[in-house]
Amino acid sequence: MENRMVTPFDVEDDREQYSLRPTTLKEYIGQKKVKANLDIFIKAAKKRSESLDHVLFYGPPGLGKTTLANIIANEMTGNLKVTSGPAIEKAGDLAAILTSLTDYDVLFIDEIHRLNRSIEEILYPAMEDYALDIVIGKGAAAKSIRLDLPKFTLIGATTRVGLLTSPLRDRFGMLCAMEFYTDEELMEIVVRSAAILNVNICREAAFEIGKRSRGTPRIANRLLKRVRDYCDVKHDGDIDLQGAKAALDLLEVDKEGLDKIDNKILEAIIFNFKGGPVGLETLAYFIGEELDTIEDVYEPYLIQKGFIMRTPRGRVASEKAYNHFGVTKKEEKDNQVSIFNK
């Protein structure tokens, strides 16, 4: 998965993307409902000279959760402190972060569903009362001291909202579902990023890149950079539709945004498991991927695009998946030959 061009996760090559991120809500493209709500809540908080209520962003990776956290910090004129659930190993780690904050600061915790439960409980008074409870001493001599915390905003991000405990989830004032972007929104993101990178690109080429970006801005920016490399070498540096298509075909990202691994999953269901249903564990074992990786990384897009369906008995290939390989269910049953052997 590490070398996938269409992985939605942050990789080393994406570091340049930080310079492409918008810094205000006005610059931010997509997520219209989330953006509209945040605009109202931020303006209301600033009007009352209060910190913004705590926010939880949830949805697939690469859709702009971290970018929105940066924007909120900028709009609230506070500093952004970034950490993650797995990085906070001890109660003292979280206490140190909380006591370093000032009014209107934003604490962003990525993968918040992976917080240790004992550490999570420290957040409860911090979120509700802006207070930190510390126990000093041991045994009968132990006593609890409450420290006041500044009026900060906690922003949590998760790809697995169902794994959050109810007490933690209920303490967020705003729960924002991040959705996949439309092809048109991704085209606008590509055009904007190309301008920042000083690359000339036609809108048709930008749309082609956006269309193959799996509804994910992070992937769109990554593909843009690789298409730029191709056109710098094979063309005059400008990106036209022909150059974009040639570069993306060379990268093995097809017109639906699927790569070799996506096609491998569909091939397995159709040609090796007769279209399904097939259990997720069996499918993961067959294609050599982790179960969680399939469920969190590959499956959301394949379901969202209508290639596979979840059923109580397992995963089933849709008619669209059969059409993708140019076969019908009848042809597949008459010829149970795996594409893997071709």
Swiss-Prot record:
Residues 255-342 are annotated as: Head domain (RuvB-H). The lineage of its organism: Bacteria, Bacillati, Bacillota, Clostridia, Eubacteriales. CDD domains: AAA (cd00009). Has 3 domains, the large (RuvB-L) and small ATPase (RuvB-S) domains and the C-terminal head (RuvB-H) domain. The head domain binds DNA, while the ATPase domains jointly bind ATP, ADP or are empty depending on the state of the subunit in the translocation cycle. During a single DNA translocation step the structure of each domain remains the same, but their relative positions change. This is Holliday junction branch migration complex subunit RuvB. GO terms for cellular component: cytoplasm; Holliday junction resolvase complex. Its EC number is 3.6.4.-. Residues 1-181 are annotated as: Large ATPase domain (RuvB-L). GO terms for biological process: DNA recombination; DNA repair. SMART domains: AAA. DNA binds at R310, R315. It comes from the Bacteria. Residues 182-252 are annotated as: Small ATPAse domain (RuvB-S). ATP binds at L20, R21, G62, K65, T66, T67, E128, D129, Y130, R171, Y181, R218. The keyword DNA damage applies. The gene is ruvB. The RuvA-RuvB-RuvC complex processes Holliday junction (HJ) DNA during genetic recombination and DNA repair, while the RuvA-RuvB complex plays an important role in the rescue of blocked DNA replication forks via replication fork reversal (RFR). RuvA specifically binds to HJ cruciform DNA, conferring on it an open structure. The RuvB hexamer acts as an ATP-dependent pump, pulling dsDNA into and through the RuvAB complex. RuvB forms 2 homohexamers on either side of HJ DNA bound by 1 or 2 RuvA tetramers; 4 subunits per hexamer contact DNA at a time. The keyword ATP-binding applies. Its main location: cytoplasm. It catalyses: ATP + H2O = ADP + phosphate + H(+). It is an enzyme of class 3 (hydrolase). Homohexamer. Forms an RuvA(8)-RuvB(12)-Holliday junction (HJ) complex. HJ DNA is sandwiched between 2 RuvA tetramers; dsDNA enters through RuvA and exits via RuvB. An RuvB hexamer assembles on each DNA strand where it exits the tetramer. Each RuvB hexamer is contacted by two RuvA subunits (via domain III) on 2 adjacent RuvB subunits; this complex drives branch migration. In the full resolvosome a probable DNA-RuvA(4)-RuvB(12)-RuvC(2) complex forms which resolves the HJ. Mg(2+) binds at T66. It is found in: Cytoplasm. Keywords: ATP-binding, Cytoplasm, DNA damage, DNA recombination, DNA repair, DNA-binding, Hydrolase, Nucleotide-binding. Belongs to the RuvB family. GO terms for molecular function: ATP binding; ATP hydrolysis activity; four-way junction DNA binding; four-way junction helicase activity. InterPro entries: AAA+_ATPase (IPR003593), AAA_lid_4 (IPR041445), DNA_helicase_Holl-junc_RuvB (IPR004605), P-loop_NTPase (IPR027417), RuvB-like_N (IPR008824), RuvB_C (IPR008823), WH-like_DNA-bd_sf (IPR036388), WH_DNA-bd_sf (IPR036390).
